[in-house]
Amino acid sequence: MTIKLITFDLDDTLWDTAPVIVSAEATLRQWLTEHAPNLGGVPVEHLWAIRERVLLAQPNLKHRISALRRQVLFHALEQAGYDHAQANQLADQSFEVFLHARHQLEIFPEVQPTLEALANHFALGVVTNGNADVRRLGLADYFKFALCAEDIGIAKPDARLFHEALQRGEATADTAVHIGDHPGDDIAGAQQAGLRAIWFNPNGKTWEAEHAPDAEIRSLNELPGLLARWHRGA
């Protein structure tokens, strides 16, 4: 097969996400304790309740996780007694604190060598439901585009997100491959859009979904060899 475009998931594909989110949440909490003491110790359950109310009022934020988080912070701050202007300012500042901390992550060591090798032969893109920014991580030069669910309000596994990626990558589904860790969002989503899908499975989990991925890898450094075999028709 001829491959022109390779798209990548980000979270839990190019780095381990859970530790950095836990750390970012802790950093946010500490900042709020210092700069918004009225809110500082609010229970997490209270924030989740606000989140549900925000989504009921603004369902279009479902896939815009940055805007949603900022709205939750704003409403929590208002309810804690800050006036509208203060709540707006503190929400902006606290969200930026979270976003900065969210990018203090450790990219898997094989990521950059693999991207460098692939970028010499293929167009590379990002398709993510998260709010990580490859520009903040020094990875932007490898990618022709980075498509986030927030950009168009549609999230994986919706095929429309992958169709948008094909347009931006100037490719057709039969010449594109997607790599990701999530059986539904990444594998099923890509396959439903007509792409081949490679399951990134570093921990050797058992595949349990009905339709198997087109291939499985434990490390991203397996990608160049796998794609070369596909190109040869092996």
Residue ranges and their predicted role:
Residues 1-6, 18, 85-87, 112-234:
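Asp-based, Mg2+/Mn2+-dependent phosphohydrolase catalytic module
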